[in-house]
């Protein structure tokens, strides 16, 4: 079940609120300019699936997003607990960073924890299959896939180079809860 935990930056151990209803999550994130939608991930995709397999299975949804928002690049991140670089990838994604463009993710399998640092608050969004999240350009955030990742997410970009992170150098991510395996 998707959820949203909202923390004040001074209280990383105690959330101000925890939401589990889709409408509540979507409206709370919309107040911060973050899009949170539920799309149908109908194809049976397992973590570890190839990029070609995932894109082929979800071409209709990808085309819709690309047309709707003008995205020009798409890729897939598909990780399971056997991935040889899971520790390195987790460490990189756990560093607070921002992008010069919106960060769009459509989860077609598994789950991951997207954590957004907006002003004095931290929004921890547990994304699961069928969740689409679009984080506005410039928003500080990090992503936790857990010690034993199990997810597939389609990523869309305005930048032809794909995923380009600008790391903040802040250690805030280490103070907040991570995805529990």
What are the language-model segments listed below?
Residues 127-147:
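Conserved metal-binding segment of the jelly-roll/cupin
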Residues 75-100:
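Conserved short histidine dyad/triad with adjacent acidic residue
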Residues 144-181:
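Double-stranded beta-helix
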Residues 1-71:
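N-terminal leader/capping segments at the start of a protein or of a new domain
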Residues 86, 114-116, 123:
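Short, solvent-exposed loop/turn segments at secondary-structure junctions
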Residues 8, 38, 75-78, 155:
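Structural signal for conserved beta-strand scaffold positions within catalytic alpha/beta enzyme cores
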Residues 98-118:
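Short, conserved beta-strand element in jelly-roll/cupin
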């Amino acid at each position: 079940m998707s959820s949203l935990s909202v923390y004040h930056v001074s209280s990383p151990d105690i959330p101000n609120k925890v939401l589990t209803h889709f409408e509540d999550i979507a409206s709370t994130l919309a107040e911060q300019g973050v899009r949170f939608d539920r799309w149908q991930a109908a194809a049976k995709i397992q973590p570890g699936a190839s990029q070609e397999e995932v894109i082929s299975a979800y071409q209709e949804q990808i085309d819709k997003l690309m047309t709707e928002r003008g995205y020009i690049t798409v890729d897939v991140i598909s990780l399971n607990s056997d991935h040889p670089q899971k520790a390195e990838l987790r460490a990189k994604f756990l560093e607070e960073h921002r992008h010069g463009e919106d960060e769009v993710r459509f989860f077609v399998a598994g789950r991951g924890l997207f954590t957004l640092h907006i002003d004095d608050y931290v929004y921890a969004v547990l994304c699961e299959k069928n969740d689409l999240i679009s984080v506005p350009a410039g928003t500080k955030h990090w992503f936790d896939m857990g010690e034993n990742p199990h997810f597939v997410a389609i990523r869309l970009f305005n930048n032809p180079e794909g995923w380009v992170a600008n790391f903040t150098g802040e250690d805030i991510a280490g103070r907040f809860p991570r995805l529990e395996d």
